[in-house]
């Protein structure tokens, strides 16, 4: 797949040109023959051509750039017969429609990487594993532990739905055109449903409210958002009233979200 098109800055396109790196990324997905693979933004096919070599059962490609949609449409019959190509912005894809078991992979554009991962971990019920290349700063946030500078809303949200594993750093010279920052690979392993947030809308609202004031004490934040009997709830969960959001684990935030629901408080419907 050596056909080239001019990268579109408006789409945040940086094409991976290092075949060795592409091979390492796909290998992390641990594809077995016959498994279903979902690739977001295949572009010139740096990852796709390695995926073909594993003889997947179904290969679903979502591509926003019409040039690359045409390209992959022209080559798909040469490889895997069960290839479906959607000409679509991945942010608008109906993730709930995926049936069966899927593995997801992508070199995500920097400008939409966080938003896509947010959606995927909480909406794809049939995902067994995902491998993403993102801006290193985003990877740091995805893997961050409580009490660290990078720990925040994205960390808590994603780690509540999946185990996140750091892969490796990819330097700018591996791309065309070269980005100004390093990229990094992360692998996500979805957690069992019983370990995930029970009400994702409430959970999202709670963590966003808390991290808007990450340096304030929890008792002040909960009082401000109208959390009734917050002191008793904090004591029941085992959170100090003087604790700050950045020090709490995703499990504690999930328990706090459940306590909030029990208060029968009206909470915003938008997340």
Swiss-Prot record:
A Pfam family hit: RrnaAD
Catalytic activity: adenosine(1518)/adenosine(1519) in 16S rRNA + 4 S-adenosyl-L-methionine = N(6)-dimethyladenosine(1518)/N(6)-dimethyladenosine(1519) in 16S rRNA + 4 S-adenosyl-L-homocysteine + 4 H(+)
SMART domains, A to Z: rADc
Binding site for S-adenosyl-L-methionine: 14, 16, 41, 63, 89, 107
Enzyme class label: transferase
Xref: SUPFAM superfamilies: S-adenosyl-L-methionine-dependent methyltransferases
Protein keywords: Cytoplasm, Methyltransferase, RNA-binding, rRNA processing, S-adenosyl-L-methionine, Transferase
Cellular compartments annotated: Cytoplasm
Any one GO molecular-function label of the UniProt entry: RNA binding
GO cellular component terms given for this protein: cytosol
PROSITE patterns noted in UniProt: RRNA_A_DIMETH (PS01131), SAM_RNA_A_N6_MT (PS51689)
Matching Gene3D superfamilies: Ribosomal RNA adenine dimethylase-like, domain 2, Vaccinia Virus protein VP39
EC number, UniProt record: 2.1.1.182
UniProt cross-references to HAMAP family, sorted A to Z: 16SrRNA_methyltr_A (MF_00607)
Annotated function: Specifically dimethylates two adjacent adenosines (A1518 and A1519) in the loop of a conserved hairpin near the 3'-end of 16S rRNA in the 30S particle. May play a critical role in biogenesis of 30S subunits.
Family: Belongs to the class I-like SAM-binding methyltransferase superfamily. rRNA adenine N(6)-methyltransferase family. RsmA subfamily.
Protein name (record): Ribosomal RNA small subunit methyltransferase A
Organism from which the protein derives: Lawsonia intracellularis (strain PHE/MN1-00)
């Amino acid at each position: 797949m050596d056909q080239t098109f001019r990268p579109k800055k408006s789409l945040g396109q940086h094409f991976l040109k290092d075949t060795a790196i592409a091979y390492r990324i796909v290998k992390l997905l641990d594809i077995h023959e016959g498994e279903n693979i979902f690739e977001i933004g295949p572009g010139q096919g740096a990852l796709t051509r390695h995926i073909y070599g594993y003889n997947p059962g179904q290969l679903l490609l979502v591509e926003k750039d019409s040039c690359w949609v045409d390209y992959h449409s022209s080559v798909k019959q040469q490889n895997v017969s069960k290839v479906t190509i959607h000409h679509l912005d991945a942010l608008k894809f109906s993730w709930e429609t995926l049936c069966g078991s899927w593995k997801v992979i992508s070199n995500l554009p920097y400008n939409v990487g966080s938003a896509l991962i947010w959606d995927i971990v909480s909406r794809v019920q049939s995902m067994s594993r995902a491998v993403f290349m993102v801006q290193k700063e985003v990877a740091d946030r995805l893997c961050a532990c409580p009490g660290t500078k990078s720990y925040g809303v994205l960390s808590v949200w994603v780690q509540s739905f999946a185990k996140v594993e750091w892969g490796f750093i990819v330097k700018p010279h591996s791309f065309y055109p070269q980005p100004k920052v390093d990229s990094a690979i992360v692998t996500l392993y979805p957690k069992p449903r019983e370990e995930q947030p029970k009400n994702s809308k409430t959970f999202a609202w709670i963590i966003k409210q808390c991290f808007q004031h990450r340096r304030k004490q929890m008792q002040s934040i909960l009082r401000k958002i109208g959390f009734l009997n917050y002191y008793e709830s904090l004591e029941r969960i085992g959170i100090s009233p003087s604790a700050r959001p950045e020090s709490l684990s995703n499990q504690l935030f999930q328990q706090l979200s459940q306590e909030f629901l029990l208060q029968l408080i009206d909470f915003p419907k938008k997340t």
